[in-house]
């Protein structure tokens, strides 16, 4: 009988407090991989963490992106820059400008957004082509899905 009560106790704890198997605690980071596998050197990283910029306001989520070895945006057509793009499909999306470093050949691109209040669960983070004149986004060059970052 004692064994039964012990097993029942453990089961109730497991059911009441399930382990978040796919969750990462903040801060967390993800490696952005190229959509086109021919872009072997293109990679990126997204750092996700909480920031509190204007206390006593609530903390917000920051997404910072660094992308390296990307082809010139114009090599894909009518594009002149890259943007960071994050989306919770069917809910909300955020876009932010990525800025090139001063190297003439193959600059790195970096940028951030500090104003996200949504939960970082099932979020797709991308580096996408952009036309700064028309404000139109092009296809994704680097991408990664975040199952959960809390």
Swiss-Prot record:
Keyword Signal on entry: yes
Stretch forming the signal peptide: 1-23
Keywords recorded for this protein, A-Z: Signal
Protein name: SPbeta prophage-derived uncharacterized protein YoqH
């Amino acid at each position: 009988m004692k064994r039964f009560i012990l097993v029942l106790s453990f089961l109730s704890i497991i059911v009441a407090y399930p382990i978040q198997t796919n969750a990462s605690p903040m801060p967390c980071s993800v490696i952005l991989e190229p959509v086109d596998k021919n872009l072997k050197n293109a990679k990126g990283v997204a750092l996700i963490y909480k920031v509190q910029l204007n206390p006593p306001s609530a903390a917000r989520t920051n997404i910072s992106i660094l992308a390296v070895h990307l082809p010139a945006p114009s090599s894909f057509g009518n594009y002149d820059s890259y943007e960071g793009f994050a989306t919770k499909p069917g809910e909300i999306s955020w876009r932010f400008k990525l800025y090139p470093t001063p190297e003439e050949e193959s600059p790195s691109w970096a940028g951030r957004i500090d104003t996200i209040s949504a939960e970082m669960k099932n979020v797709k983070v991308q580096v996408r082509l952009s036309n700064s004149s028309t404000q139109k986004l092009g296809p994704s060059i680097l991408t990664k899905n975040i199952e959960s970052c809390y």
